[in-house]
């Protein structure tokens, strides 16, 4: 149970692929103009990570070490192709919005890195959990950044959610404030860089506060030689 908890905590927070490892920044900065796009690409990446880790782990005993990387890339490409066809079939609007960034998941360092660092050494179910946790950590970072940019840039939240979830999701659209002059900086790539920098700063402050709190609550160590003295 402690290993499972550690995998989840590492993926979601301590070793977050976007906020700690700073991997996959190209789609993170390019696609997060809205919360819907960010959520769509994040969930697609999570599905690819989970299935890839599961497959790599299941085949690890029969994968020659000398050619393991090309095999991993073939597995990832196959999974990404399947996910791309699913999105094209059931969420065509989202497919058009994400464009080239769906097939580019194949080259994402997060996917190849987890296959090599974790899935090739652990069992299938732990590997699948690792992929899911890493993917959800990246999805969370994308969603927060996409939400901030959409709110500041358009004054809305979940605009176009029906392209991801279907027609019923139109009711999820929220107009937080009305503006005739959108805040363009938030919608452009420089705004994504600034938003990511602010998120990194907030995470650092939270980590430092948690570290200080643990240090204050930890029992003080008894100096050597002091035991038994009156």
Swiss-Prot record:
InterPro entries in the cross-refs: NqrDE/RnfAE, RnfE
GO terms for biological process, alphabetical: electron transport chain
One GO term describing the cellular component: plasma membrane
Keywords for this protein: Cell inner membrane, Cell membrane, Electron transport, Membrane, Translocase, Transmembrane, Transmembrane helix, Transport
Transmembrane segments: 18-38, 39-59, 63-83, 86-106, 125-145, 182-202
Pfam families: Rnf-Nqr
Topology with respect to the bilayer: Multi-pass membrane protein
EC number: 7.-.-.-
Major enzyme class: translocase
Subcellular location: Cell inner membrane
Family: Belongs to the NqrDE/RnfAE family.
Role according to the record: Part of a membrane-bound complex that couples electron transfer with translocation of ions across the membrane. Required to maintain the reduced state of SoxR.
Complexes and interactors: The complex is composed of six subunits: RsxA, RsxB, RsxC, RsxD, RsxE and RsxG.
Protein name (record): Ion-translocating oxidoreductase complex subunit E
